[in-house]
């Protein structure tokens, strides 16, 4: 039997104990009350069929399950351990002179502070387009202290899957231009640790990518999308 990312590292019971021990032990009950049955159906379609699903852990941000699934290419059910996560937004803030605002943020799972675009989870998993755009503008204000200028525009750049081998997390890309400073400044969450926030030219971003100074997958992805659409030049100088 073939298993996904987590199951390759842990047997089911070990997985459950390790993950639940790191989070709120009452979270699964709270999650079930708020979102019962949502995650197990929303991504499946066509000839994909979930035969069974076992939940290992859930909180307000994620759920870990092992599903037995039939796929178009594999009619014999296979077991796969999946992390369901809320969708997210990733925003590229662009100033009038074409600079992109990046933040340098501490990330506990990797034990590093890295440069990245502002981003954040969408609270409502069933959000419509307006709610997703509102979340993008909120994250822009909270993390950078910038907002759209009066004549600014928020451009949707599509979406991507962050790591489809083990999670269904979907990220929505946006370009916000031009931006201006908010009078009240950033309004960051208590759990965030943003050490720096400043603008970079396209040449600087290109160099940072080439030198592996930008290592955040969300940021690399949105830079690729901007370059493909001719909105950001990443040609080496």
Predicted segments — roles?
Residues 1, 19-23:
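Short hydrophobic transmembrane-like helices used for membrane targeting/insertion
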Residues 4, 9-15, 29, 34:
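Short, low-complexity, charge-dense intrinsically disordered segments
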Residues 34-42:
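Short, Lys/Arg-enriched N-terminal segments with co-localized hydrophobic residues
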Residues 42-48, 113, 120, 156, ...:
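Nudix hydrolase/Nudix homology domain
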Residues 44-47, 83-86, 90-138, 184, ...:
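Conserved Nudix-box catalytic region and its N-terminal flanking loop in Nudix hydrolases
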Residues 52-97, 105:
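Acidic, metal-coordinating catalytic segment for phosphate/diphosphate chemistry
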Residues 54, 63, 86-87, 94-96, ...:
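Active-site segment of metal-dependent pyrophosphate-handling enzymes
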Residues 64-66, 92, 102, 173-175, ...:
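Conserved hydrophobic/aromatic beta-strand scaffold that supports enzyme active sites
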């Amino acid at each position: 039997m073939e298993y996904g990312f987590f199951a390759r590292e842990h047997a089911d019971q070990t997985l459950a104990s390790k993950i639940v021990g790191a989070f709120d032990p009452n979270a699964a009950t709270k999650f079930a009350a708020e979102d019962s049955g949502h995650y197990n159906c929303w991504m499946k379609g066509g000839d994909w069929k979930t035969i069974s699903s076992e939940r290992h852990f859930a909180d307000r941000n994620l759920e870990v399950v092992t599903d037995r699934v039939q796929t178009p290419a594999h009619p014999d059910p296979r077991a796969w351990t999946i992390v369901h996560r809320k969708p997210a937004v990733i925003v590229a803030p662009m100033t009038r002179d074409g600079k992109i605002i990046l933040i340098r943020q501490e990330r506990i799972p990797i034990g590093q502070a890295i440069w990245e675009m502002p981003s954040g989870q969408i609270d409502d998993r069933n959000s419509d387009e307006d709610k997703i755009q509102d979340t993008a503008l909120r994250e822009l204000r909270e993390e950078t202290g910038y907002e759209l200028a009066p004549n600014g525009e928020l451009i949707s750049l599509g979406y991507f899957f962050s790591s489809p081998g083990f999670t269904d997390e979907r990220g929505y890309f946006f370009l916000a231009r031009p931006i201006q400073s908010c009078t009240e400044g950033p309004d960051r969450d208590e759990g965030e640790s943003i050490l720096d926030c400043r603008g970079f030219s396209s040449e600087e971003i290109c160099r940072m990518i080439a030198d592996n100074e930008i290592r955040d997958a969300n940021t690399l992805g949105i830079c690729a999308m901007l370059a493909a659409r001719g909105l950001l030049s990443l040609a080496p100088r």
